[in-house]
């Protein structure tokens, strides 16, 4: 049995109901039809909360949206007073196989935690993510857990465990010698957090990952070559361009980890679809990205979390990394580059994914724009906008109700009271 699938089986048993329990039940079916009646509807597209709108769901899809809908005899009415109904939120940058670094360091997670333990945690984290109203995630690398994300995705899709829809990157790709863990005796072969490849071998590695189930290819365009060093570029433009061509030919998008201006420039010119982090991005780099249609996933929450783990309490004076990140985010906003929402969740707790949304608004992005980015915007960037990210007829019924009005008070996204995925209600907080 494949090592990753074996670990997934062990993990599912560990978090299941135990020896002698009843056989697993089939995945729940959506209700025949339901009319959802919130106070208002944020459809993900126009940035407004439409008061008095209702949403009719039939099976797994949305049938109608508007103010004058009534329930026929065969339609269940779901009353959600005091709430705003939104599309299921999308986190475009998670690592379900990581957990917060103030619990266990990244090195120790990669080197010391057994795969079955990491998979069991990932199962729990997937459920927490869904319960928080995030019905889709893009998982950008298992960080040493191989292809276990493919198995977790299958378990969710088959209804074995609850969780969001997943787009997975499996192992991700790094230049030889550039990634971690680092700082060990060179005589020891240390497991790596991603797959190493260079030159023509890089395309072969990308194709292998796609063949094993990757929905997206992730490259590290820059990283710290030595422990404690600043990030520097890794791959050449030509290396990354070859991967982009291979991935796009296979119908996959490419995400690039890049924090330095040069790493971001190379990745953009290579044709990647999104750049993750962009910590030191400049006005010139963001203009280049906009011209090439490259999106930025700023991952504000990860940087915020790391500084808090180091002792910062959120007050002034801010650490230098936060000051620099604020400046780059302001430049990105001013440039008009497409922004996706993804917190690098896993650096901080799964289930608190909305932390990124709240920070983006707190750092100057209009709440309505952040909400659109977290729904229809993310769906478009990830290539799933034909079926997810908006409340409109024909779309999949991935829906979340939050207490209050998130356009007026962005913190409302943290007050999730009702969640449906594909027309199946998976969370309902008593009113």
Predicted regions, residues:
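Histidine/acidic-residue-rich catalytic or RNA/ligand-binding cores of hydrolases
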Residues: 100-102, 149, 178, 228, ...
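Active-site gating loops and adjacent loop-to-helix segments of metal-dependent hydrolytic enzymes
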Residues: 97-118, 176-191, 225-233, 290-323, ...
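Metal-associated gating/positioning segment near the N- to mid-region
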Residues: 83-160, 176, 184, 238, ...
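His/Asp/Glu-enriched, well-ordered alpha-helical/loop segment
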Residues: 108-110, 249, 321-406
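Bacterial N-terminal signal peptides
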Residues: 7-18
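Histidine/acidic residue-rich metal-binding segments in metalloenzymes
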Residues: 200-296, 320-338
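Divalent metal-dependent hydrolysis catalytic cores, especially in the metallo-beta-lactamase
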Residues: 121-147, 163-171, 214-225, 253, ...
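Histidine-rich, glycine-flanked metal-binding segment
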Residues: 27-32, 41, 46-86
């Amino acid at each position: 049995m494949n090592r990753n699938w074996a670990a997934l089986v062990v993990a599912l048993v560990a978090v299941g109901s135990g020896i002698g329990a009843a056989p697993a039940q089939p995945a729940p079916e959506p209700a025949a039809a339901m009319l959802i009646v919130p106070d208002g509807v944020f459809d993900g597209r126009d940035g407004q909360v439409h008061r008095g709108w209702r949403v009719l769901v039939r099976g797994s899809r949305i049938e109608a949206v508007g103010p004058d809908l009534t329930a026929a005899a065969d339609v269940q009415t779901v009353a959600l007073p005091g709430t705003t109904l939104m599309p299921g939120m999308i986190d475009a940058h998670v690592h379900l196989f990581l957990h917060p670094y103030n619990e266990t360091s990244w090195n120790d997670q990669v080197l010391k935690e057994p795969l079955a333990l990491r998979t069991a945690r990932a199962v729990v984290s997937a459920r927490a993510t869904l319960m928080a109203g995030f019905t889709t995630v893009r998982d950008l690398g298992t960080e040493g857990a191989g292809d276990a994300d493919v198995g977790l995705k299958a378990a969710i899709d088959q209804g074995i465990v609850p969780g969001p829809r997943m787009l997975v990157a499996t192992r991700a790709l790094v230049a030889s010698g550039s990634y971690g863990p680092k700082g060990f005796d060179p005589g020891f072969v240390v497991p790596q957090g991603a797959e190493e490849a260079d030159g023509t071998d890089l395309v072969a590695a990308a194709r292998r990952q796609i063949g094993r189930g990757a929905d997206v290819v992730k490259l590290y365009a820059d990283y710290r070559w030595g422990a404690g060093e600043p990030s520097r570029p890794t791959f050449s433009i030509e290396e990354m361009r070859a991967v982009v061509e291979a991935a796009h030919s296979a119908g996959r998008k490419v995400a690039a980890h890049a924090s330095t201006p040069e790493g971001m420039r190379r990745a953009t010119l290579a044709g990647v679809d999104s750049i993750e982090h962009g910590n030191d991005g400049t006005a010139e780099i963001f203009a280049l990205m906009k011209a090439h249609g490259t999106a930025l996933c700023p991952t504000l929450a990860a940087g915020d979390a790391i500084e808090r783990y180091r002792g910062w309490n959120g007050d002034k004076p801010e650490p230098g990394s936060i000051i620099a990140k604020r400046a780059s985010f302001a430049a990105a906003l001013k440039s008009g580059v497409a922004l996706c929402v993804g917190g690098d969740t896993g650096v901080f707790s799964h289930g608190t994914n909305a932390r990124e949304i709240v920070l983006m608004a707190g750092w100057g992005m209009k709440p309505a724009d952040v909400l659109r980015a977290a729904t229809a915007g993310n769906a478009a960037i990830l290539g799933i906008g034909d079926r997810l990210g908006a409340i409109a007829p024909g779309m999949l019924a991935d829906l979340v109700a939050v207490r209050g009005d998130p356009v007026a008070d962005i913190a409302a996204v943290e007050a999730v009271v009702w969640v449906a995925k594909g027309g199946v209600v998976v969370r309902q907080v008593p009113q």
